[in-house]
């Protein structure tokens, strides 16, 4: 009798559902997966090593490029670690601005996840809907930093600058005439806070539209219910964090359990799943978008009523205002020193973690008293999730691999670093 052997299949790295450069070596019995071996490292850029050769401030831009769809949350973890070593506390207004932009980033990330996850499984419409809202939020990034993605807006001691009083508007072009541009610009006539407030009023209706397309859709449920089930105990053992852990029914969120920035002064709920499958993780992320919208609303209200400084008044750490540089030689020297050799951080080590959209993004920083980190270690949430791939796909069909990769919300920038 002929020997029956398992079939080995390479999934990725050139695959639209591989979310970057994932290579999976799948051992299959017919259509059923027996084993999955993820191969990582194809997007390794030596970020941790690069940070050791640059002054502390110059590595903020590298953080944006780790998980490149949750940019400001990565920056937050890094500057938080530096602030711990320096022993400085950002002004309260800066804390609220950070909280607001962390939540804008969370919505940006979840919209990208939902659109891509839907497209992977075959729901094309939701992809177009999600990118419609992402445009507005990227304009918020652009308003404060000039960049739509890699903002480099957070600084040790606060944020780069206060929220602008005007919003950039669209100009007439060969694609949009003056009448169309006037319609697009109608909510851009006020300040950035006005624009964000207008967005928060519209966004719940947009989430309802996504749910109309997917939540009760029987094809969506057939593809996600009971797929990639992880028990609460196993999720904790595997080091899951964020929506992957909460989807399994564990109520753990750093914003509540270890509050940072202004989260201890804001009212919001933690959505938690029941079954630990792809469908529950989808519902958790959908509800997180609604909660983030509520947090942004509260931040906008507070920021309107409380003007003030947005960065510490210490020119050894924070850049001085340009007006002072024109009149005061000492301030000019501070500016020159800050942007050439930076500042020396006291000897010691610190771990700072933030609740990034994908889970706990942690930065472990060791300083030897120089102006560069001695060692920078990034704790990427996606790495722990990808490590569970073999366990999650065993016994499932080949088509379910795509649903499981999608539900993990994997970005290889942070996994390969």
UniProtKB/Swiss-Prot annotation:
E.C. numbers: 7.1.1.-
Membrane topology, from the record: Peripheral membrane protein
GO cellular component entries: plasma membrane
NAD keyword on record: yes
Localisation per UniProt entry: Cell inner membrane
Assigned keywords, A-Z: Cell inner membrane, Cell membrane, Membrane, NAD, Quinone, Translocase, Transport, Ubiquinone
Biological role stated in the UniProt entry: NDH-1 shuttles electrons from NADH, via FMN and iron-sulfur (Fe-S) centers, to quinones in the respiratory chain. The immediate electron acceptor for the enzyme in this species is believed to be ubiquinone. Couples the redox reaction to proton translocation (for every two electrons transferred, four hydrogen ions are translocated across the cytoplasmic membrane), and thus conserves the redox energy in a proton gradient.
NCBIfam families linked: NuoD (TIGR01962), PRK06075.1 (NF004739)
Quaternary organization: NDH-1 is composed of 14 different subunits. Subunits NuoB, C, D, E, F, and G constitute the peripheral sector of the complex.
Protein name in the entry: NADH-quinone oxidoreductase subunit D
Protein's organism: Nitrosococcus oceani (strain ATCC 19707 / BCRC 17464 / JCM 30415 / NCIMB 11848 / C-107)
